[in-house]
């Protein structure tokens, strides 16, 4: 089994006084489900944002499937941010089409199957859904990719 994520000597902070990671080293093998636990402000979201390329480490390296974080790694990572980010005026079916166009590994059948199981009508706009159903749609979209790494930031918050 190969390593999915390799983090080596990572340093990350905010400003001069807030160091989040000093010398972070971490190896995550394929085929595992890993949860990050810790109090608010402990660096969970910072680590997630570095994994998906939204933040850069000051020092050290992060490799996913052998590649530095960048276009090659983004092609194999499916990311669920902590906040809903979809345009509320889109129909869910339009969202599926956007994901299908944008991600080569998006499985449209999987998305519609999950919607059916959760009684979510793909012809509804997101605006008409409850907050919980909006979050379910976002999770469906992320999990309908055939990614090698799923990164979920506060999926059950």
Where are these regions (language model features)?
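A short, flexible loop at the N-terminus of ABC-type nucleotide-binding domains that lies
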Residues: 1-23, 30
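The feature captures the beta-strand-to-loop junction immediately N-terminal to the Walker
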Residues: 37-39
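ABC-family P-loop ATPase nucleotide-binding domains
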Residues: 83-141
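Catalytic Walker B motif of ABC-type/P-loop ATPase nucleotide-binding domains
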Residues: 150-154
């Amino acid at each position: 089994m190969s390593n999915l994520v390799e983090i080596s000597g990572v340093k990350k902070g905010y400003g001069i006084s807030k160091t989040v990671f000093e010398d972070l080293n971490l190896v995550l093998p394929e085929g595992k489900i890993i949860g990050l636990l810790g109090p608010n402000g402990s660096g969970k979201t910072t680590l997630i944002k570095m994994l998906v390329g939204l933040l850069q480490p000051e020092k050290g390296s992060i490799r996913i499937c052998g590649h530095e974080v960048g276009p090659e790694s983004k092609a194999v990572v499916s990311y669920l941010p902590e906040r809903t980010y979809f345009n509320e005026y889109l129909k869910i079916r339009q969202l599926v089409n956007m994901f299908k166009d944008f991600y080569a590994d998006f499985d449209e059948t999987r998305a519609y199957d999950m919607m059916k199981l959760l009684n979510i009508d793909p012809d509804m706009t997101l605006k008409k859904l409850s907050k919980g159903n909006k979050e379910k749609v976002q999770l469906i979209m992320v999990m309908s990719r055939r990614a090698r790494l799923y990164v979920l930031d506060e999926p059950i918050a």
